Amino acid sequence: MASFLEKVLRTGDKRVLKRLRTYADAVNSLEDSFKELSDAELRAETDAFRERIADGESLDRLLPEAFAAVREAASRTLGQRHFDVQIMGGAALHLGYIAEMKTGEGKTLVATAPAYLNALAGKGVHVVTVNDYLAEYQANLMGRVYRFLGLETGVILGGQEPAVRREQYAADITYGTNNEFGFDYLRDNMAWTEDELVQRGHNFAIVDEVDSILIDEARTPLIISGPASGEANRWYREFATVVQKLSPETDYEVDEKKRTVGVLEPGIEKVEDWLGIDNLYESRNTPLIGFLNNAIKAKELFRNNKDYIVAGGEVKIVDEHTGRVLAGRRYNEGVHQAIEAKEGVEIKPENQTMATITLQNYFRLYDKLSGMTGTAQTEAAEFMNTYEIGVVAIPPHRGIAREDKRDVVYKNEATKYAAVVRDIEERHEKGQPVLVGTASVEKSEYLSRLLAKRGVRHEVLNAKNHAREAAIVAQAGRKGAVTVATNMAGRGTDIMLGGNAEFNAVDRMAELGLDPERDAEEYEARWPEVLKACEEATRSEHEEVLEAGGLYVLGTERHESRRIDNQLRGRSGRQGDPGESRFYLSLSDDLMRLFNPGAAQRLMAIAPDDVPVTGRLITSGIANAQNQVEGRNAEQRKNVLKYDDVLNRQREVIYKDRKRILMGDDIEDQIRQFTEEVLSSTIAERTGKGHPEDWDLDGLWEALRAVYPVSLTPDEVVEEAGGRPRLTSDFLQEQILSDATVMYLEREEELGSEAMRNLERRVLLSVIGQRWPEHLYEMDYLKEGIGLRAMAQRDPLVEYQREGHAMFQDMMAAIREQTVVTLFNLEVRKQRTGAAGGAVELSAPQRPAFLQYTAPDEDGTPHAEVEAVDPGARERTSEDGTPTDASAGTDPAASSDRPEGETGGNRAKRRGASARSGSKAKRGKRR
């Protein structure tokens, strides 16, 4: 199906390209007339465009003129003129396509035209990048074009105060990372006042490196969590000790490919003996299974100095693909705590989910979505199925002159790396720059040691120098440069032969103390001379590198995805420059060992140690292994989306209701409806069966008093009905609802109408804030065990949808009940405000001091980061990653004095999903 869809999508490319070419021709026809405009006249075009949009003119019709204005502005401010293919790429973005443009085609400049055009409507444009550095760099550089045309540019960075973020979002065009945009959306839906909101809608997004963000990172949802109750540390340490006594294969199984573990019968018996329990799988022992599985994972699947390092008494994750220490990030679902127990360091607490969304569903919020990347065609079908956006391949400005050489495969790693070092030495000696891609930090450091022994000067991008990443990558095209990096490191930074003059110019301006925002006039005045000096310095070296053969990209291992391999190759041969690429592999590489072990083992048996192996078997083996991984990952993303779609429908209901309350809507009628439903349900439960003489009116009144202060007595109601036999459920409801209305009006008269409306909003927000995280917990717990339904011949997804809907209805009923109970029973203190009388004192909900943010890294692996949210503790703590206990915002009812005997908190029965105490543990599977 996917391959058929890909063919259909490719067929449509020609029609789209024809349309884009028409737009480019129209822009070209306007170029001379825009060149004749003065700076002031060119800037005035922006106001003219806005007036035409206000009069009803469409953006499509305005495109040629707006693009021509941006082209001329970029030429005057940056010294860069949009090529025709860049205009075509920009038009594709405006039309809501993903533009596939090869490395070096100037994608950053491409985004300026559609961003400007769409910003004219006044609804904001978001430009999404892969990291904070690129967001800030692009906002500063391209912001010069926008400011020249009279638009404001903002940038969202980690650690910014809400007031600063709100200001940045108010700009016409805002740069930032997918995680920052997504977390701001979630935080807005956790806000307690309108003043706390920072985003202003989701109009149009341009996603840079769109495949990385919407594909690679889409397996992991964004999660905001706060510490859960319970003491699990003892069990983490206990099981860290227990698993040391268990043996792989005998007591448990490990699947490295799927990164899963399973406990075998002998292992279960040993654990039961150690813990002194009869049956590990009894319901009361179920949480222990999660601790056991995580302890085995920590022992077998996570290695020190590869997946993480231990520094300063903390376990710090190392991103295997970028080589960076992910400061403050943590594995979720108890895995990080299990590793901490294994390493004998302090165990930080687990957390409870407070808000979550997948990247797929976040980006579906935008009215229009587009993106750019050098490698999208392989995922065209998934982009269409998931996001309903097509991929169009934009032709390069100049043909690609890079020579992609055939893979060289050795029997083992030692001979492979010996050949790699020889090849690097030869290239280095003739002055050809070399970019070496490795699969992990461990491998990059190993290769670095080999190069050092041979006296080859080189730079290494790893956990120890990630702060210099962009600078190192930008200069990786200089004569004789050797740069060793993990495959994904430095993505988004252009490698220019002879050095990156523009990058050097930005650095030079910073050295001169000039800021593009603060010193806009002086910055613009000095830029041309600084850029010219940097260009002259790199021009002669550029020619020398061209003669040496251009950039040589050497891959030391194939990535799981063909797309990542293509990205690595694509670093060479930009803008028609010469270049080469080659992969050196070994039969013991992870990809071959895990995903095509049969082919690898057969070749290992016959291959000589120091002679490279070639042939169709190798090529097909690699392709087969990559297809397996890509298929598995695509299935995971599809599965994540299916289940999140269920939760997304619920989230939309909650967030829409919450936003309405937050914006100050009058919810008096909604509260009245809540009261009717809660009381009617309470009455129906106790009068639905039997004759009136059999009804337990005393029990009913006890239940009613737990909801509101009833002023009627059972005898008064019976007398009003004309006797017990004539009593009906409808009559009871009429009397009780009338009484409740009177009592509520009395309360409103006591507090004042305005204060009552405010109290209604605050209480309902608070109850939603308490119940929604509880529901997320229950849904997560349901999802963990739902796969077992397949054993009973039932579709797990259908079961999840059915039970999830029932749980959502329970939660909504619980919200209604708790809101009504709190409004009737909450004791509200008054303050004297002079002769005018009393004012109601409403305490703000308690705020957590810290929250944990879980998000995918560049390859989609989930990691968590802890950040202070308390105004007095705003400083971001990700550098040391120390999480601090925090609780969710509390219900005003929970933090205020209530009349004794009139609270709903001591009711015997709670409607809806109840929150479990203690840390959540995965359900185990006996094998």
UniProtKB/Swiss-Prot annotation:
ATP binds at Q86, G104, E105, G106, K107, T108, D494. Residues 907-927 have a biased composition (Basic residues). Keywords: ATP-binding, Cell membrane, Cytoplasm, Membrane, Nucleotide-binding, Protein transport, Translocase, Translocation, Transport. The keyword Endoplasmic reticulum does not apply. Its EC number is 7.4.2.8. Belongs to the SecA family. This is Protein translocase subunit SecA. The gene is secA.
